[in-house]
Each structure stands twice: as C-alpha cells, then as structure tokens.
Amino acid sequence: MLRKVGDLTRVPPTGHPPCTLQPGARLNRMSQKVAVLGTGKIGEALLSGMIRAGWAPADLLVTARRPERADELRSRYGVTPVTNPEAAKTADTLILTVKPQDMGTLLDELAPHVPADRLVISGAAGIPTSFFEERLATGTPVVRVMTNTPALVDEAMSVISAGTHATADHLAHTEEIFGAVGKTLRVPESQQDACTALSGSGPAYFFYLVEAMTDAGILLGLPRDKAHDLIVQSAIGAATMLRDSGEHPVKLRENVTSPAGTTINAIRELENHGVRAALIAALEAARDRSRALASGKKD
C-alpha cells in the first residue's frame, strides 16, 4: 500500500530531553529530535522536505564532514550542525544517509553513544538491518529505507522495511519522515534488493531513455531543445496517465497503437532489438549488485 503523508502543523517543543521509547509506545513527532547524518543530495532533500512538512528547524540536527558545509546548512535551513557522537546522544531518531562503503566507519563512531531506545533509519543501498543490529546496542530498532533522487522534487518512492526490533510505530514514524518527500511503501526486507533495482535505480533508466530518444530526435532533424521538450512532456503525460487512470500499461499502449501505424512500427523495432529482454536483464543485474553490496563486495 502506497502512503503519501500530507503537510502537518507542528508546534516546536522547548528543551526536551531525548525520549525513552518503551516497546509498543507511540512515537510522537512533536517530542522528537531528528538527526540527518550524511547531508549529500538525498540527505539535504530529506531535510528540506521535513521543514516544508512542518518540522521545526530547531529540532533537526545535521552532521557534515566539512565545516563550510555545516555552516551552509545552518544558514539555509536554520538547523543545528553537530558531531556524529553528539547526534547519537541527543537525537531521538538517527537517519543515516552516507554511502554504503562509509557506513561501517560511521557505525564504529556512533555505536558507543547510541542508546538502545534510539530509532536508527538507514538509507544505504544493499546493507541489511542485521548489519546495524550487530554493531549497535542489543534491542536497537532499525528501519531500512531505499529512496530515490526524485526526493529532490518531493516525488520520491521510498521503500521501507523493519528490522528485528522495529515496531509498527517505528515504521509509521519513518513513513511520516519520508512521506515529506514523496510516497512510501512497506515491504519485507527480503524484497529490498528487487525494489532497489526497480525504484532506487529506476530514475536513471528513464533519464537514459530520454537521452536516447533526444538523440533520435536530433537524427530526425529536430533541434535538441525541441526534442527534449517533446520527450519530457510526453513522459510526464504518460506517467500521469499510468498513475491516475488505473489502466494496465498494455491497455494504454494499445490505445495509441493503430493498425499499420507509426507506433506499431516503432514497437516492432524495439522488440526486434530485444529492448524488453535488455530491461529485464538490467534490473536483474541491479538486483544482483545490491545483493553483492550486502555481502561486502566492492567490485
């Protein structure tokens, strides 16, 4: 089931201590401090989306490797830069958005400072919740999230899975956070690698197709800017029809495929060149790479 969390009004708390969440207790956003550790493009998109959705900047903590980056985030959003250990000690929820290859080092730094009642949310591709549970205090709730770059425009698809100690309320809290930048979907963790292949990497496939179709437009005699505009608007329209009509994509394709027409001739060439099989193979390769990341392989 897809979930889109709407804007909510938030009254900022004043000087609360970190909350202690008992098993089954209800998470309350109005008594939460959230820290984003790793403020690259996705981390910053999540930060800005949360503020637009009603989180008070005073309750948002950030970490950054470079002091100038920390100052930039403070100036732009009014958030509080802290060190990684300070974030672990102060925040109720830790969102880890560093690269997968950097996660082990980050956890080594955090582990001595993370109490077992902190919610830890990982946004790293391919790393299972067990990786965190083995390195953090026993009983620490961990939620795994795979989001994608459309978070930059509040159109992300974020796939959420619970670790061993994460409750329904932890999942709901995670959905509220990532719902600020798009839609969320709960899946068993065993499906995360497949979801990474489809939606985590998915935007890149569409960009690749737009690039190829733009080149085709140039070959057919169109200026690059006009070819680009034609393709992008067609993509937006097609995606909107898929989302809003409820029709199967085959039906929508058939509606524009006239007998002996231009579309069926184009589809024939796509089939002759194995485009469908290539897409399936590409997604299998992405799935396999996600699995390899989980096993610690770098190449």
Predicted regions: what they are:
Residues P57-L60, A116-R118, P141, D225:
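Short acidic capping loops at alpha-helix termini that bridge into adjacent secondary structure
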Residues L60, A70, A88, M103, ...:
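Small-residue helix-packing motif on alpha-helices
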Residues L46-L47, P67-E68, R76-Y77, P81-I160, ...:
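Rossmann-like NAD(P)(H) cofactor-binding subdomain of soluble oxidoreductases
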Residues V142-V143, Q192-A197, P249-E254:
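Short pre-catalytic strand/loop immediately N-terminal to key active-site residues, enriched for Gly-Thr
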Residues N28, V232-D299:
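NAD(P)-dependent Rossmann-like dehydrogenase/reductase catalytic/cofactor-binding core
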Residues H16, T20-P85, K89, E155-A156, ...:
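NAD(P)+-binding Rossmann beta1-loop-alpha1 motif at the extreme N-terminus of oxidoreductases
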Residues F131-P141, M157-C195, F207-D244, R289:
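Internal alpha-helical scaffold of NAD(P)-dependent oxidoreductase catalytic cores
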